[in-house]
């Protein structure tokens, strides 16, 4: 939340930037809006906004469906004048991989969620180079 930004800023005084992450719910977008405002006030560069859990990906057939109902996160990015980095759909395999000590992305690069993660990471890396 926005209350942690002061602490992060004191630990990393030359912060290159932050990535804001939200889910499609109105409450989450309200909270991230406060974080964006705080970062702007503190002159912390915002690399962009990621829409997390943007739908559900079936681990068997890779079809996507809605997970949350809410507002379009791209609209929030436009309103706040920050780059929209993309959306990452929820995949139940992420939790199972994490619990077993494995990395989801390494084993699932070709999945819908893996490709979405890769796309977002490429945009972040391009932004900070």
Regions found by a protein language model. Give the residues of each.
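Short glycine/serine/threonine-rich phosphate/pyrophosphate-binding segments
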Residues: 1-6, 29-31
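Active-site glycine- and acidic-residue-rich loops that bind
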Residues: 25-31, 66-67
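C-terminal lobe/tail of nucleotide-utilizing enzymes
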Residues: 36-129
